[in-house]
Amino acid sequence: MFFGEFEHALDAKGRLIIPAKFRELLGTSFVITRGMDGCIFGYPAERWATLQAQLDDLPLTRKDARAFVRFFYAAAAECELDKQGRVMIPATLRQYAKLEKQCVIVGVSDRFEIWGAEHWQQFETETAANFDDLAENLIDF
């Protein structure tokens, strides 16, 4: 399970260090793609295969399903970590998530997310202001 928040710098070549505890869960190959809220989603290969099967079950006749699947898959990239534990983030994904120098890598259960630090701070501030209401409407601790 992915959890925690880690800040790392994106280097000049577009490489980002993935936290050691996440590397253990990712194995040799994983997939990154466009995520919700302007971040990048990252999935271990096994979870990606499950998600792929779910997306394959969406009805081709629905315009919104076609648009979502097309947009989601178009930016997907199969990745491997280098010897320093870095992943190369493709330019299209860096642009989509507005990644600059500082990035935040966040664990979210079965996936991880990559955010630009400024965008993450904005999301965190907005969400913190509504956290009690979100919890009340979604889950009983």
UniProtKB/Swiss-Prot annotation:
SpoVT-AbrB domain boundaries: 5-47, 76-119
A single MF term (Gene Ontology): DNA-binding transcription factor activity
GO biological process: negative regulation of DNA-templated transcription initiation
Major location (coarse): cytoplasm
Coiled coil: none
Transmembrane residue ranges: none
Key words of the record: Cytoplasm, DNA-binding, Repeat, Transcription, Transcription regulation
Subcellular location(s) of the protein: Cytoplasm, Nucleoid
SUPFAM superfamilies, per the entry: AbrB/MazE/MraZ-like
GO cellular component: cytoplasm; nucleoid
A Pfam short name: MraZ
Top-level lineage group: Bacteria
HAMAP family to which the protein is assigned, alphabetical: MraZ
Family under the similarity heading: Belongs to the MraZ family.
Quaternary structure, from the entry: Forms oligomers.
Identification of the protein by name: Transcriptional regulator MraZ
Organism, scientific name: Lactiplantibacillus plantarum (strain ATCC BAA-793 / NCIMB 8826 / WCFS1) (Lactobacillus plantarum)
Lineage: Bacteria, Bacillati, Bacillota, Bacilli, Lactobacillales
